[in-house]
């Protein structure tokens, strides 16, 4: 159900995007909503998965079928919920996660929020041999020149996105200082830089 949603990308938030189609705005939870920033106000196709809970029906969206499949594999693991799976995919490509699983790299997996040693081991036990490494994932970025005011906004929005993924304000304090020393061409780029810092 809801294999994908195709329509105009109207809004970006730290945890989700809104896609309007046939007069209806669909709220879609994504690993890194700012990945779609360059498509704002344009038509997009987002691969989706609907998860029904007792208190809500949530639509999760991804930039590729590979990312969606990795998400669906991760949430089958005991101890991994949608939020943890999104946090993993916000930082890593599907192939990077698959390599960590195949190489039994528990240390890599414990870098993500909410993933302890026990859960990392469970991911490996449940998914090793079941995930296939595909051709390299591609994620293009729109390169634009940004003003200093835009730079501040990029960093602020990146911090909100990182906090939404489950990282604490204490963990992010040093990250924010480092981000402010550099220049970024988009929120997505700042988020990726922040994610690399927080898991390093």
UniProtKB/Swiss-Prot annotation:
Signal peptide span: none
Protein name: Holliday junction branch migration complex subunit RuvA
Residue runs in coiled coils: none
Subcellular location: Cytoplasm
Family named by the database record: Belongs to the RuvA family.
Quaternary context: Homotetramer. Forms an RuvA(8)-RuvB(12)-Holliday junction (HJ) complex. HJ DNA is sandwiched between 2 RuvA tetramers; dsDNA enters through RuvA and exits via RuvB. An RuvB hexamer assembles on each DNA strand where it exits the tetramer. Each RuvB hexamer is contacted by two RuvA subunits (via domain III) on 2 adjacent RuvB subunits; this complex drives branch migration. In the full resolvosome a probable DNA-RuvA(4)-RuvB(12)-RuvC(2) complex forms which resolves the HJ.
Source lineage: Bacteria, Bacillati, Bacillota, Bacilli, Bacillales
Gene responsible for this protein: ruvA
Flexible linker: annotated span: 143-149
Keywords: Cytoplasm, DNA damage, DNA recombination, DNA repair, DNA-binding
Biological function: The RuvA-RuvB-RuvC complex processes Holliday junction (HJ) DNA during genetic recombination and DNA repair, while the RuvA-RuvB complex plays an important role in the rescue of blocked DNA replication forks via replication fork reversal (RFR). RuvA specifically binds to HJ cruciform DNA, conferring on it an open structure. The RuvB hexamer acts as an ATP-dependent pump, pulling dsDNA into and through the RuvAB complex. HJ branch migration allows RuvC to scan DNA until it finds its consensus sequence, where it cleaves and resolves the cruciform DNA.
């Amino acid at each position: 159900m809801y294999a994908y949603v195709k329509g105009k990308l109207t809004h970006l938030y730290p945890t989700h995007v809104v896609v309007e189609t046939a007069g209806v705005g669909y709220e879609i939870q994504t690993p890194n909503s700012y990945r779609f920033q360059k498509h704002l106000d344009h038509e997009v196709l987002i691969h989706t998965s609907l998860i029904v809970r007792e208190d809500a029906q949530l639509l999760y969206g991804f930039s590729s079928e590979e990312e969606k499949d990795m998400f669906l594999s991760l949430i089958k693991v005991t101890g991994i919920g949608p939020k943890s799976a999104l946090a993993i995919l916000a930082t890593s490509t599907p192939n990077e996660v698959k390599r960590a699983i195949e190489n039994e790299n528990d240390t890599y997996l414990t870098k993500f929020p909410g993933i302890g040693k026990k859960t990392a081991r469970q991911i490996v036990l449940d998914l090793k041999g079941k995930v296939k490494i595909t051709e390299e994932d591609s994620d293009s970025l729109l390169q634009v020149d940004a003003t200093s005011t835009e730079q501040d906004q990029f960093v602020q929005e990146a911090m909100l996105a990182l906090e939404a993924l489950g990282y604490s304000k204490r963990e992010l304090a040093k990250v924010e200082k480092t981000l402010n020393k550099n220049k970024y061409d988009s929120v997505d780029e700042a988020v990726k830089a922040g994610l690399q810092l927080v898991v390093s």
